[in-house]
């Protein structure tokens, strides 16, 4: 499943108020899938805030590689917290992920 489809499913589960299904889905995500969603969230945040200073983020995989270099260690150290954020701060995540989905 493509990362955009995972994001749409997360948003659907969140807004359907099916907490049990949402928790089951987020618990079943692999470490790489969570990192992909986290990367998409960070890209959405960059697009939202205009921090790309005129540089257009055109290629998700290239950007993911760039973020991997900068943030993979941070992600590995905080993976459990980031995974928990998928359920506790999901509204904020979805807001930023919306920018990612619109962009790509």
Residue ranges and their predicted role:
Residues 1-104:
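A charge-rich, low-complexity, intrinsically flexible signal that marks solvent-exposed coils, linkers
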